[in-house]
């Protein structure tokens, strides 16, 4: 397979992939409002108004049992106690990286203080929000069939005041809340924030000073009305996965997009040692229970809200006894190094390089190299260039093999033309004679294609690394490029990319190319240039450097194999 056809195949594969993603995104956007309007959960979804049946909260410690797929466990009235003096006041907790507004039961608003919404702005990203158009909350509460549990507004801060801030030099902020129920039952909830950490520790202690056993289970959920993204090939937010993900030791990493949220009837599954999360571009929220505690994992819809919930563990607390449960709530960016510090199996997959494990592994390896280059170069733009250079050096033997195969094929083009003239329209005899020639001269017709097929997964994985890595968000390179995730404001990199593609075409020998292929090749630089004009500068930088190095390698290989680059350019210009 000659070099031109290989390039053409690769180019059209890229265009086809981008068009397919664009079509899928537009189709999802058209269907999303209908799904939100038609899917609803039973009224028993609200744990403040309902709870599992007696069979689901036994006197021992198992969690509520899963029902049939797509259903919610049978429920009846909860013995929830109303707040003694109305809704609890909203309390603000502030660390160096987070500002949370909560009522003791729900985190109503979460601002990421080190991530401004815009490059030049000061307003931080609000990941959790009370915005009535797109509410997004994290909630943890208790449910029971017979025993009293805290309702909305039931938890109150133990300390006076509504604002708690981590002081300079302080590494932790601990804020306890308490619910005092009837008959001597109380639940103490403690929020712990740590400096530089996006995982919030939430510990509940059930203290039973009554004269009867207390039965109940904890639930933890994430709920949001998904934002309908503007769809476009140049919008990285629409490329990224948006939806729920969960992990179990048995099944591994799984995910469900918001547009497909109730496919296969949602989710009802008992899991020990997992986690559940809602993902969007660059950021995510997750509930991470204790490793040894089992929970019922539920995906459902509550009107326009998509809900991901953990139910359990369940407790029976004897009179005079105490029981506790603890979980982490992650609210923050997909920072690889901080996620690794949480030491949670499978949580690294929230950096969603691909739903396929092999591509995700390649992506993780590429980011590992990229991050180490950044630690040395202190600039993500130069780190991208360094990574492409290393990849090109590592893959040089494949590129050389690809070109040598193409050069060998070109040397036998006159003989192939003679065979075609000899056998005319007898395609069978022509193919037989061609294969005999290949066998005699030890030519592998796939020699130019196989190296490309090996390289493609690596470069596709690198593309997703650049799209998904929050570390590159609003990061500058040099001069006019002050944000690698925004488009080039002066279109310099896209124009360079067009020039490099044009030069590559002119340098590529094209003997025997039919007129249709030649016309298609002439338009390819322009097609790619238009697409690249509005893509993030970091991606275009990758393409420019990769294409430029490819051009240099091709020039070198042509000289090595005795062909005159100037003559090739003159021939292709005709």
From Swiss-Prot:
<keyword id="KW-0812">Transmembrane</keyword>
<protein>
    <recommendedName>
        <fullName>Membrane protein insertase YidC</fullName>
    </recommendedName>
</protein>
<feature type="transmembrane region" description="Helical">
    <location>
        <begin position="489"/>
        <end position="509"/>
    </location>
</feature>
<dbReference type="InterPro" id="IPR047196">
    <property type="entry name" value="YidC_ALB_C"/>
</dbReference>
<feature type="transmembrane region" description="Helical">
    <location>
        <begin position="6"/>
        <end position="26"/>
    </location>
</feature>
<comment type="function">
    <text>Required for the insertion and/or proper folding and/or complex formation of integral membrane proteins into the membrane. Involved in integration of membrane proteins that insert both dependently and independently of the Sec translocase complex, as well as at least some lipoproteins. Aids folding of multispanning membrane proteins.</text>
</comment>
<dbReference type="GO" id="GO:0005886">
    <property type="term" value="C:plasma membrane"/>
</dbReference>
<dbReference type="InterPro" id="IPR028055">
    <property type="entry name" value="YidC/Oxa/ALB_C"/>
</dbReference>
<dbReference type="GO" id="GO:0051205">
    <property type="term" value="P:protein insertion into membrane"/>
</dbReference>
<keyword id="KW-0813">Transport</keyword>
<dbReference type="InterPro" id="IPR038221">
    <property type="entry name" value="YidC_periplasmic_sf"/>
</dbReference>
<feature type="transmembrane region" description="Helical">
    <location>
        <begin position="356"/>
        <end position="376"/>
    </location>
</feature>
<keyword id="KW-0472">Membrane</keyword>
<comment type="similarity">
    <text>Belongs to the OXA1/ALB3/YidC family. Type 1 subfamily.</text>
</comment>
<feature type="transmembrane region" description="Helical">
    <location>
        <begin position="380"/>
        <end position="400"/>
    </location>
</feature>
<keyword id="KW-0143">Chaperone</keyword>
<feature type="transmembrane region" description="Helical">
    <location>
        <begin position="447"/>
        <end position="467"/>
    </location>
</feature>
<dbReference type="InterPro" id="IPR001708">
    <property type="entry name" value="YidC/ALB3/OXA1/COX18"/>
</dbReference>
<comment type="subunit">
    <text>Interacts with the Sec translocase complex via SecD. Specifically interacts with transmembrane segments of nascent integral membrane proteins during membrane integration.</text>
</comment>
<keyword id="KW-1003">Cell membrane</keyword>
<dbReference type="InterPro" id="IPR019998">
    <property type="entry name" value="Membr_insert_YidC"/>
</dbReference>
<dbReference type="GO" id="GO:0015031">
    <property type="term" value="P:protein transport"/>
</dbReference>
<keyword id="KW-1133">Transmembrane helix</keyword>
<dbReference type="InterPro" id="IPR028053">
    <property type="entry name" value="Membr_insert_YidC_N"/>
</dbReference>
<keyword id="KW-0997">Cell inner membrane</keyword>
<keyword id="KW-0653">Protein transport</keyword>
<feature type="region of interest" description="Disordered">
    <location>
        <begin position="45"/>
        <end position="77"/>
    </location>
</feature>
<dbReference type="Pfam" id="PF02096">
    <property type="entry name" value="60KD_IMP"/>
</dbReference>
<dbReference type="GO" id="GO:0032977">
    <property type="term" value="F:membrane insertase activity"/>
</dbReference>
<feature type="transmembrane region" description="Helical">
    <location>
        <begin position="525"/>
        <end position="545"/>
    </location>
</feature>
<dbReference type="Pfam" id="PF14849">
    <property type="entry name" value="YidC_periplas"/>
</dbReference>
């Amino acid at each position: 397979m000659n070099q031109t056809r290989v390039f053409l195949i690769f180019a059209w594969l890229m265009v086809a992939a981008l068009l397919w993603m664009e079509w899928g995104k537009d189709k999802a956007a058209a269907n999303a409002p209908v799904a939100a309007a038609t899917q609803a959960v039973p009224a028993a979804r609200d744990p403040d108004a309902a709870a599992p049946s007696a069979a689901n909260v036994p006197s021992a410690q198992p969690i509520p049992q899963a029902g049939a797929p797509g259903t919610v466990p049978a429920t009846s009235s909860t013995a929830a106690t109303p707040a003694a003096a109305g809704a609890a006041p909203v309390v603000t907790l502030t660390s160096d990286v987070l500002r949370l507004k909560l009522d003791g039961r729900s985190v109503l608003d979460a601002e990421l203080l080190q991530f401004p919404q815009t490059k030049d702005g000061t307003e931080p990203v609000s990941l959790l929000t009370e915005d009535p158009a797109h509410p997004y909350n994290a909630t943890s509460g208790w449910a029971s069939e017979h025993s009293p549990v805290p309702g909305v507004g039931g938890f109150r801060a133990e300390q006076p005041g509504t604002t708690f801030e981590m002081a300079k030099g302080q590494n932790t902020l601990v804020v306890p809340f308490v619910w005092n129920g009837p008959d001597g039952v109380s639940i103490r909830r403690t929020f712990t924030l740590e400096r530089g950490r996006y995982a919030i520790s939430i510990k509940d202690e059930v203290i039973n000073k009554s004269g009867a056993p207390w039965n109940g289970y904890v639930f933890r959920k994430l709920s949001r009305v998904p934002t309908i993204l503007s769809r476009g090939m140049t919008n990285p937010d629409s490329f990224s996965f948006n939806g729920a993900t969960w992990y179990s030791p048995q099944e591994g990493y799984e995910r469900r997009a918001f547009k497909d949220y109730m496919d296969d009837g949602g989710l009802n599954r008992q899991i020990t040692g997992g986690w559940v999360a809602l993902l969007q571009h660059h950021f995510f929220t997750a509930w991470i229970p204790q490793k040894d505690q089992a929970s019922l994992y539920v995906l459902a819809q509550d009107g326009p809200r998509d809900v991901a919930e953990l139910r359990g563990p369940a407790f029976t607390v004897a009179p005079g006894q105490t029981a506790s449960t603890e979980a982490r709530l992650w609210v923050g960016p997909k920072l690889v190094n901080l996620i690794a510090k949480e030491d949670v199996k499978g949580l690294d997959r929230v950096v969603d390089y691909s739903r396929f494990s092999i591509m995700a592994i390649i992506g993780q390896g590429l980011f590992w190299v990229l991050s180490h280059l950044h630690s040395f170069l202190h600039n993500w733009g130069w780190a991208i260039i360094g990574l492409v250079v290393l990849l090109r050096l590592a893959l040089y033997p494949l590129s050389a093999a690809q070109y040598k195969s193409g050069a060998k094929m070109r040397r036998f083009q006159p003989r192939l033309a003679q065979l075609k003239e000899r056998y005319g329209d007898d395609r069978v005899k022509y193919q037989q004679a061609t294969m005999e020639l290949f066998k005699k001269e030890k030519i592998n017709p796939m020699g130019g294609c196989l190296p490309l097929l090996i390289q493609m997964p690596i470069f596709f994985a690198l593309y997703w690394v650049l799209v998904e890595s929050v570390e590159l968000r609003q990061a500058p390179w040099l001069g006019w490029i002050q944000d690698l995730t925004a488009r080039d404001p002066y279109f310099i990199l896209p124009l360079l990319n067009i020039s490099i593609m044009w030069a590559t075409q002119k340098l590529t020998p094209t003997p025997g190319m039919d007129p249709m292929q030649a016309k298609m090749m002439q338009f390819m630089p322009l097609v790619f240039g238009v697409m690249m004009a509005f893509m993030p500068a970091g991606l275009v930088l990758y393409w420019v450097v990769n294409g430029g190095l490819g051009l240099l390698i091709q020039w070198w290989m042509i000289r090595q194999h005795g062909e005159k680059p100037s003559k090739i350019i003159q021939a292709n210009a005709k």
